[in-house]
Every structure is written in structure tokens, then in C-alpha cells.
Curated annotation (Swiss-Prot):
The active site is at residue 204. Glycans are attached at residues 110, 396. Monomer. PROSITE patterns: CARBOXYLESTERASE_B_1 (PS00122), CARBOXYLESTERASE_B_2 (PS00941). Specifically expressed in the ejaculatory bulbs of male. Its EC number is 3.1.1.1. This is Esterase S. It is an enzyme of class 3 (hydrolase).
Length: 542
């Protein structure tokens, strides 16, 4: 009985302290001051790990333990981690800081609640760019029923470079996330959050990150549910092969010539200027911003002392040795828009760049489709030609045939991998597994930004649903129907966090566990419906 009452007593104690002056919060590090934003409070840029600089560069993340002598200013928005960002239009795409490992907490003003369920947010960005500050919390804060915590983690070389051994084991970005989630669990009660009622939510590589976190069985004790939007642990870009070769190649670009071993490479890389280190990413890109994330998660060497991944996620799922919590995965009918849209951009002569694929397909396809290091060159060419014939037949690459390319990218980069994840969970898991497809094209979208044109209707693409949950200037202003859908999606997530039930409007999500056919909820402009299919990758769910 005492074991039950103690957490409740602590929760009430923290709730009382936040009610007396909700802007001041006491942490083990000292006192911090947040901001009153009218209908919600924010506590931003709170460090959870030591900055990965100097001796800590390319090392395992360490918890932040510094004591504050004065009240910590938690009114400053989070900063980007140092990155070469696709979302910057200028030639110099460098932005951010190495001192970036923070959490930012957004608490509604809802006096009817003593404590709130918690949505822990992991942002996306191709393992190479993106930031917590890009995605707003207005939809959740306006609704007022959950606390949102945004985490900031390392991307690019600092987050995912690996030498394939214990010297630079890799997965630092995922280990940052793991540390942030534990920080949230240990401290969220001080802000009025329920530490026993946390769900993870991520988009794109953030969605894959959420799923990868579930590969640790003990996470069932840290979180009670998870949502992966447009990304899982089994999409082809989720785990990288041959990371060691890429690390040494990158070192050579930075002037680390002919290191004898991983230790020599690491010593050289640590001496490299951080901005030069990150900016060098552009030399790995073979077409615009392709590959989108040359560095990514890896299966770590058995000699690593505290590994994040020791086997492929698919093997972990099939073993059943993963966190058994309710999990929701989603996609859009044209998810591949994100990867394909830049082909619609025009070059300096006004010619669509998609036509370059007619002479460069064998060269570029492996980088677009995430297999540049997994096959031999002869095998890659054969595979690339097979895919071209499967989706385009003998047609040339052109704007007229653009949607065949978009369908290729959608199926090969998203639908097949997401289906594989859901199929493995329903066969080998013990907890509920849910899925939805969102079909309501945006007038203003990420795809249009990348294509630099609005004269072509591209369909429902990556982010069209996500940015109704986490607002972004790229998607604004919303249409009237999108505002209604946004409210319903937010309520869906809130109910999932509070009650572990999944309902969108009047559509109850069916559980896929043990089912022979996939059970989906289709969310459209002004409707929702349940759908049963054998394969949504082949079925072409619209």
C-alpha cells in the first residue's frame, strides 16, 4: 500500500508547488523560470545531457548534472543542433549549435487537471537535419489536455557516424533520445505531468526513432504507448549498412588521410572544426540533397559496452523481445512525395530535373532508394533497372511520367517497410497494434516547398497529417476542413495518451494483433472508415 501511495503523494506535492507559482519549477539542478504564453506555459531549452563538444564529441551522451547558482532562464526557444539543413534555400545551409541537447515542455492552462498525460515528441529530418523548434505545439496547447515535451537530439556526423566498432559505435542520436525520455520520466511530475502516462510521437525519422526506442524491452516500463507517423524501424532508410567505410571516406574529405585504425580516425575528427565537419556533408550529396541522410542508425559491434542496437530491428520484433506497448503506425498514399518532389524543380535553363534521371538513373537510384552500400555495383544496376521497368516500363523519365516515380518512391521507401513492421508486430507481439492512412491533400505542403512550384497537384504526401498535430509555417494557413481534422487528430492522440483507446471521430481503430488481414482506419477530408486489406503496399490504399 505504501508503494502505491508514495508516487501519488509526490505527484500531489509537485502539483501543489507548480500551482503556487507555475512559472517557477524546482529541479535537482536548481530553480528554473518559464514563460506565460496566454493559454499555456512553456519551459524551454532545459539541458538533459552535456553538450557533445571538445572531449565529449563522438562520445556516449552524459546526463547533465550542473547545479545552477541562479534561476535558470527557461524562456529561450530551443536551438537547432548543428546541421546542413535541406530547409535552407541558400547555398550555405549551415545552421545550429553543438550545445543543443535540451527538452522543452509545454503545459496547458487547464485548472480542471491536477496532472496531465504526456506526449514526448521526437522530430524528424532524414537523420541529418530538423529541429524541435520547427514544429509548434499550438494544436495541443489550445486543446489543453496533455503536456507536450519536445526533445532535441544530435543529427548528422555527431549523431550517427560509426566506425563499426567500439571506438565510434554510432547511434548517439538515439542514445540522446533514450536519455531524454528517462529525464522526462524522472522530472515531468515537477511540471504537472504524469510520469506513468507518457507516450512517444514522432514523424519521418522521428517515427522510425520512436519505433527503434521500442526495440528495448524495458521501455515498456518507461512509456505506455507510441505513435510512428510516416516512418518505422523497418523502412529501408532506418538502419545503415557499411557505416565504417563511410566514416573513413568522410574522414578523408576532412583531411584525415590514411588513418591506420578507428582510433586514429577519431583522434583526427575530434580536432576538426565542428562547422567544417558538418558542412562537409554536401560533398556526399550526389543530386540536390540526395542522399537525404548519409549517416544513420547502425547495428553496433558486440564489443560496445552500452549498445543501442545489437541486431536488426526486424529480428528483434520477430523474437518478441521488444517493448510491449500499444503502437500506432501511419502513412499517406503519396508518402514518397518528400523524396520525389525535388525532381519537379527546374534547373537554371527552366528544364525539370527529373529528366536527368534518363542518363543518371543507375548512378542515382541507389542514393534515392537507400541501397548504395548494401549491393555490389553490378547488382545495384540490375536492381535499379528492375525497379524502373516495374514502375515505368519502357517510358522515359519526364514530368508526364512523374507520378510513376512518386509511386515508386512511396512503395519502396515507405509502404513496404511500414507494412513489414505492422505484419511483424501482429504476428510476434503481445500488445495492440494499430494503423491509419491519411488521405486529404494539403494546398500548402512540404512537397510544394521542395518542388518550388504549386501548379501540380501532388496528392496527399508526407507531413500533410503530421503538421495538423504539430503546426508549421509551411502548412499555414489551414483550410477550414483541415482545422476540423486537426482538432480530431489532436483528440485522438489525447485519448490515446489518457486512456490507451484509439478513436478518430466515430471510427474505432481495430487491433491488428493476430489478424490475417491488415485493419486500417482511413482518414479523409470529411470522413473516416475502417478498411481491411491483405497488403496496403500492393493494394494501393487511397
Amino acid at each position: 500500500m505504501t508503494q502505491i501511495l508514495l508516487p501519488i503523494a509526490l505527484l500531489c506535492l509537485f502539483a501543489a508547488s507548480t500551482l503556487s507559482n507555475p512559472l517557477l519549477v524546482e529541479l535537482p539542478n536548481g530553480e528554473l523560470r518559464g514563460r506565460d504564453n496566454g493559454f499555456y506555459y512553456s519551459y524551454e531549452s532545459i539541458p538533459y545531457a552535456e553538450p557533445p563538444i571538445d572531449d565529449l564529441c563522438l562520445e556516449e551522451p552524459r546526463p547533465y548534472t550542473e547545479r545552477w547558482e541562479n534561476t535558470f532562464d527557461a524562456t529561450r526557444p530551443p536551438v537547432d543542433c548543428l546541421q546542413w539543413s535541406q530547409l535552407i534555400s541558400q547555398p550555405n545551409k549551415l545552421t545550429g549549435s553543438e550545445d543543443c541537447l535540451t527538452v522543452s515542455i509545454y503545459k496547458p492552462k487547464n485548472l480542471t487537471r491536477i496532472s496531465f498525460p504526456v506526449v514526448a515528441h521526437i522530430f524528424g529530418g532524414g537523420w541529418s537535419f530538423g529541429a524541435a523548434i520547427d514544429d509548434g505545439v499550438r494544436p495541443f496547447s489550445s486543446s489543453g489536455n496533455v503536456i507536450v515535451v519536445k526533445t532535441t537530439t544530435e543529427w548528422e556526423r555527431l549523431g550517427f557516424m560509426s566506425t563499426g566498432d567500439s571506438v565510434i559505435p554510432g547511434n548517439f542520436g538515439l542514445k540522446d533520445q533514450r536519455l531524454a525520455i528517462k529525464w522526462i520520466r524522472n522530472n515531468i511530475a515537477r511540471f504537472g505531468g504524469d510520469p506513468h502516462n507518457i507516450i512517444l510521437l514522432g514523424f519521418s525519422t522521428g517515427g522510425s526513432s520512436v519505433h527503434l526506442q521500442l526495440m528495448h524491452k524495458e521501455y515498456g516500463q518507461l512509456v505506455k504507448g507510441a505513435i510512428s507517423i510516416s516512418g518505422t524501424a523497418t523502412v529501408p532508410w532506418a538502419v545503415q549498412a557499411n557505416a565504417r567505410d563511410l566514416a573513413f571516406r568522410y574522414g578523408k574529405l576532412l583531411g584525415c588521410n590514411n588513418p591506420k585504425n578507428s582510433r586514429e580516425l577519431k583522434d583526427c575528427l575530434k580536432k576538426t572544426d565542428a562547422e567544417e565537419f558538418v558542412s562537409t556533408l554536401r560533398h556526399l550529396q550526389v543530386f540536390d540533397y540526395v542522399p537525404f541522410g548519409p549517416f544513420g542508425p547502425v547495428v553496433e559491434s558486440p564489443e560496445v559496452e552500452s549498445p543501442f542496437l545489437t541486431e536488426l530491428p526486424l529480428d528483434t520484433i520477430r523474437s518478441g523481445n521488444f517493448a510491449q506497448v500499444p503502437w500506432l503506425a501511419s502513412y499517406t498514399p503519396e508518402n514518397g512525395i518528400y523524396n520525389a518532389a525535388l525532381l519537379l524543380a527546374k534547373d537554371a535553363n527552366g528544364k525539370e530535373r527529373i529528366e536527368e534521371l534518363n542518363t543518371r538513373w543507375n548512378e542515382l537510384a541507389p542514393y534515392f532508394l537507400a541501397y548504395p552500400y548494401t549491393l555490389k555495383r553490378s547488382e545495384m544496376n540490375a536492381h535499379s533497372q528492375k525497379l524502373k521497368y516495374q514502375y515505368l516500363g519502357y517510358k522515359n523519365f519526364s514530368v508526364v511520367n512523374y507520378f510513376d516515380v512518386q509511386r515508386l518512391f512511396t512503395n519502396e521507401l515507405y509502404k513496404k517497410g511500414i507494412e513489414l513492421s505492422l505484419d511483424s508486430h501482429r504476428k510476434h507481439g503481445a500488445s495492440p497494434v494499430y494503423a491509419y492512412v491519411y488521405d486529404n491533400p494539403a494546398d500548402k505542403s512540404l512537397a510544394q516547398f521542395l518542388a518550388k512550384r504549386s501548379d501540380i497537384s501532388l496528392g496527399t504526401g508526407m507531413g500533410d497529417d503530421y503538421y495538423l498535430l504539430m503546426n508549421n509555417p509551411l502548412r499555414e494557413p489551414l483550410r477550414a476542413d483541415e482545422k476540423i481534422v486537426s482538432w480530431k487528430l489532436v483528440k485522438m492522440v489525447e485519448d490515446f495518451a489518457a486512456h490507451e483507446t484509439l478513436v478518430y471521430d466515430d471510427c474505432v481503430f481495430p487491433n491488428n494483433l493476430g489478424k490475417k488481414k491488415f485493419q486500417l482506419v482511413v482518414i479523409g477530408r470529411n470522413y473516416c472508415k475502417q478498411l481491411e486489406v491483405e497488403s496496403f503496399a500492393r493494394h494501393g490504399v487511397q
